[in-house]
Amino acid sequence: MKRRVLVDTGPLVAILSSVDHHHAACVKALHQLPGPLFSCWPVITEAVWLLRSHPSAVQQLLRSCFSEKPGGFLELLPLAGTEASAIAEVMKQYQDIRPQLADAALVYLAARERIDTIFTLDRRDFAVYRSWQKRPFRIVP
C-alpha cells in the first residue's frame, strides 16, 4: 500500500504562488510524493484567505478540490459536525502551543485515517504534535 500524505496550508500556498519563497521546494516535493495528497476544509479555508490577493491561485486551488480526474493532486477528507468535539480535544491537548483549527483538524485526521506523514512548512508545531502511534510525524519537505 502506498504511503498517504496529509498536506497543510503552507505548501498549498507555496505551490500556487510562484512568488512564495518556498515555491520551488514545495513544487519539487509535490512531484516526489505519492498522489493524491489529503487535506480538509479548515486547511483550504486558511489557504484561500492567504491567497486572497491572487484570485487565479484561489480558483486553481478550489478546482483541485473538486477535480473528478483520477490522479488529481488533492483530495479533501470529510469532517462531520460530530467530529468537532474531537478536534476541540486536540486543541485542548496542545493548548500550550495554541494550535490553529487547521492544524488540529489535520492531527485529528491523521489519527482517524492512520496517516503519519505531513507535508508542511510548520515544522515548529508539527514537531510537537504526535501521530496516532504517539510518535513524531514524518515531515516533508
Regions found by a protein language model. Name each.
Residues 3-5, 24-98, 108, 112-116, ...:
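PIN-domain endoribonuclease scaffold, especially VapC-family toxins
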